[in-house]
């Protein structure tokens, strides 16, 4: 594998928007019993449903441990799904995997961020995370993609969204958290994002969704739907702890121009619930020192914004909630040329994330 000493921007590469043409989507099989209940079996069933939904639109590669390889291969029984053996600590490939970048000559490379399990030993979600730290490089090696390495700079893919035209959205709650890059200022972080993703403007939302254990990842709160337009998780209930977070984000978006000088059009997506785990669901998770505790009294950070755009499709979570159909209608209206597929999201939410968190798109080569 070729490791490059330059930066994507210096080499003419940039991170494309999620709606750009894709070669495939990467996923990692969920199995750790101290995060996924009942040995991961319910989450694996949801994983299969999501992988098969994506595979209707484009190829999927699922990385799985040697112990679970036969099981995963048997259940992911579609020609468009490739299963490869790869060790990992958990399934969150959006965060542990690489970010792909492209240029105008038909080349694809990858950025291999440093990963510390959402905070390391200062509020991180599990230890060790050494296998997840290797995952980005392994994916790039399988794909024969040259890589850029950001030693000393921690970033998860779920903490950023880009429009492919120079603007990035993130949250202060995550990227300025002391457990990520305490040695860097906001300005230094913006410079690194510019160098490695070729963005010209970073828009900082104060916080993400309430109780998001990733420290407020933007992909669970606000996402691009096209240049100049975003979809923001929303509640009109002043008693909801998300109320102030949503309004603070809206204020920033309504009073900020993007890198192209455009004012934002902000669409609102209702937040489901409030949603909570049951005592039975929490009891099904192994209790291991150092892992995230599951508590039925703690509100879950459910969000319909945590969807994935694929070639011709939108794969969005459903929660067996009355708001599910409204969410589907909103997404279909916003993406009239895509087919909206609602996939089971509750088991993923119980594990701490959702569809966007558990997937990583690989862009197709592009030539001008």
Swiss-Prot record:
Mediates the hydrolysis of agmatine into N-carbamoylputrescine in the arginine decarboxylase (ADC) pathway of putrescine biosynthesis, a basic polyamine. The gene is aguA. Homodimer. One of its GO terms (molecular function) is protein-arginine deiminase activity. InterPro entries: Agmatine_deiminase, Peptidyl-Arg-deiminase_porph. Its EC number is 3.5.3.12. Belongs to the agmatine deiminase family. It is an enzyme of class 3 (hydrolase). Keywords: Hydrolase, Polyamine biosynthesis. The active site is at residue 357. It comes from Pseudomonas syringae pv. syringae (strain B728a). It holds the Pfam family PAD_porph. GO terms for biological process: putrescine biosynthetic process from arginine. This is Agmatine deiminase. HAMAP family: Agmatine_deimin (MF_01841). Pathway: Amine and polyamine biosynthesis; putrescine biosynthesis via agmatine pathway; N-carbamoylputrescine from agmatine: step 1/1. The keyword Hydrolase applies. It catalyses: agmatine + H2O = N-carbamoylputrescine + NH4(+). It comes from the Bacteria.
């Amino acid at each position: 594998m070729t490791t490059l000493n330059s930066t994507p921007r210096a080499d003419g590469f940039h991170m494309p928007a999620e709606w750009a043409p894709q070669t495939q989507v990467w996923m990692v099989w969920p199995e750790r019993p101290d995060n996924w209940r009942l040995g991961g079996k319910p989450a694996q069933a949801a994983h299969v449903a999501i992988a098969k939904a994506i595979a209707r639109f484009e190829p999927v590669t699922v990385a799985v441990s040697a112990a679970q390889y036969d099981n995963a291969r048997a259940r992911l029984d579609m020609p468009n799904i490739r299963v490869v053996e790869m060790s990992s600590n958990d399934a969150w490939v959006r965060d542990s995997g690489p970010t792909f970048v492209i240029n105008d000559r038909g080349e694809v490379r990858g950025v291999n961020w440093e990963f510390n399990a959402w905070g390391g030993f200062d509020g991180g979600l599990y230890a060790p995370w050494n296998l997840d730290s290797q995952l980005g490089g392994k994916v790039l090696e399988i794909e024969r993609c040259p890589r850029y390495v950001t030693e000393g700079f921690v970033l998860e893919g779920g903490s950023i969204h880009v429009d492919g035209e120079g603007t990035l959205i993130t949250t202060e709650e995550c990227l300025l958290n002391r457990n990520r890059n305490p040695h860097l200022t906001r300005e230094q972080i913006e410079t690194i994002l510019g160098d490695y993703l070729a963005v010209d403007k970073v828009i900082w939302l104060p916080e993400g969704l309430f109780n998001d254990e990733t420290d407020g990842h933007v992909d669970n709160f606000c996402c691009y739907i096209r240049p100049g337009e975003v979809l923001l998780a929303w509640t009109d209930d002043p008693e909801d702890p998300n109320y102030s977070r949503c309004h603070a984000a809206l204020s920033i978006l309504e009073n900020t121009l993007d890198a192209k000088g455009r004012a934002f059009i902000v669409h609102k997506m209702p937040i489901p619930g409030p949603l909570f785990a049951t005592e039975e669901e929490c009891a099904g998770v192994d209790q291991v020192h150092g892992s995230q505790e599951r508590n039925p009294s703690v509100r879950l950070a459910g969000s319909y914004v945590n969807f994935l755009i694929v070639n011709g499709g939108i794969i969005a979570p459903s929660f067996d909630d009355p708001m599910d159909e409204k969410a589907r209608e909103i997404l279909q209206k916003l993406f009239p040329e895509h087919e909206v597929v609602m996939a089971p999201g509750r088991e993923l939410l119980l594990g701490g994330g959702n569809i966007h968190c558990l997937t990583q798109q690989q862009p197709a080569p592009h030539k001008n």
